[in-house]
């Protein structure tokens, strides 16, 4: 589980912009992670710039692009990129060891359709991703901020849902997953109130885990212990 931003929101769900809304979490790198950053960053790393990426230039082709916010150590993201070579993948993570681990795994797997940001997710989304350019946005297991007084810090808020909607193509999907039932209820409430989305669940609640989201070791262990995971998928329709 990785916290993608230290941004806070007010009671109405409005993002409280700060001059510096995050601190890049350096952490302690293993030799392998440090080496992966040094050797793989020139080809897979994306240096933040407040101008929209040209995805065709970045990937050298036209293809649907999937963006993941807060990929943790990156194992699932690398697996997804490996299993869908016809798609482009962009990952955003503030935790440097996670970035190093992701790059190491991607290099070992021979993945060429993955690019990575070591930066604040909100800044990347607002300034570096063009509107209407993404086929899917993924937010898996974000910090649940389970204490009620901290709920306003949850990343899924009204303004965030609108930001994601703008970045998706018509027909693009915002896919969320959480192992906190209360957060899934919060996500559902926010997304049902958001304009321009349609819930892909037949009964208007959650969906079964789709094939494109790998089952993590943590999640498999949770299943054996009877813990739940909730997936929500909302399509941009306007």
From Swiss-Prot:
The keyword Isomerase does not apply. InterPro entries: SAM-dependent_MTases_sf, tRNA_(Gua-N-7)_MeTrfase_Trmb, tRNA_methyltr_TrmB_bact. Pathway: tRNA modification; N(7)-methylguanine-tRNA biosynthesis. Disulfide bonds: none annotated. Its EC number is 2.1.1.33. One of its GO terms (cellular component) is tRNA methyltransferase complex. GO terms for molecular function: tRNA (guanine(46)-N7)-methyltransferase activity. Keywords: Methyltransferase, S-adenosyl-L-methionine, Transferase, tRNA processing. The keyword Transferase applies. It catalyses: guanosine(46) in tRNA + S-adenosyl-L-methionine = N(7)-methylguanosine(46) in tRNA + S-adenosyl-L-homocysteine. The active site is at 143. SUPFAM superfamilies: S-adenosyl-L-methionine-dependent methyltransferases (SSF53335). It comes from the Bacteria. S-adenosyl-L-methionine binds at residues 68, 93, 120, 143. Substrate binds at residues 147, 179, 216-219. NCBIfam families: tRNA (guanosine(46)-N7)-methyltransferase TrmB. Catalyzes the formation of N(7)-methylguanine at position 46 (m7G46) in tRNA. Belongs to the class I-like SAM-binding methyltransferase superfamily. TrmB family. This is tRNA (guanine-N(7)-)-methyltransferase. It comes from Shewanella sp. (strain ANA-3).
């Amino acid at each position: 589980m990785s916290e993608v931003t230290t941004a806070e929101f007010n009671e109405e769900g409005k993002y409280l912009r700060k001059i510096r809304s995050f601190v890049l979490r350096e952490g302690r790198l293993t030799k392998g992670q440090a080496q992966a950053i040094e050797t793989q960053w020139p080809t897979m790393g994306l240096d933040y710039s407040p101008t929209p990426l040209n995805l065709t230039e970045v990937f050298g082709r036209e293809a649907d692009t999937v963006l993941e916010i807060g990929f943790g150590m990156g194992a699932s993201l690398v697996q997804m990129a490996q299993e869908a070579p016809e798609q482009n993948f962009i990952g955003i993570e503030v935790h440097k060891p996670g970035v190093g681990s992701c790059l190491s795994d991607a290099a070992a797997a021979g993945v060429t359709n993955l690019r990575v940001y070591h930066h604040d997710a909100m800044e990347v989304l607002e300034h570096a991703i063009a509107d209407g350019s993404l086929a899917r946005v993924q937010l898996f297991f974000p910090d649940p901020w389970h204490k009620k007084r901290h709920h306003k810090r949850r990343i899924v808020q009204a303004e965030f849902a609108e930001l994601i909607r703008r970045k998706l193509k018509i027909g693009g999907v915002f896919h969320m997953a959480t192992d906190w039932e209360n957060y899934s209820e919060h996500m559902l409430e926010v997304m049902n109130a958001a304009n321009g989305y349609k819930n892909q669940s037949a009964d208007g609640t959650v969906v079964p885990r789709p094939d494109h989201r790998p089952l993590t070791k943590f999640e498999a262990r949770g299943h054996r212990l009877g813990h739940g995971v909730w997936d929500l998928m909302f399509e941009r329709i306007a």
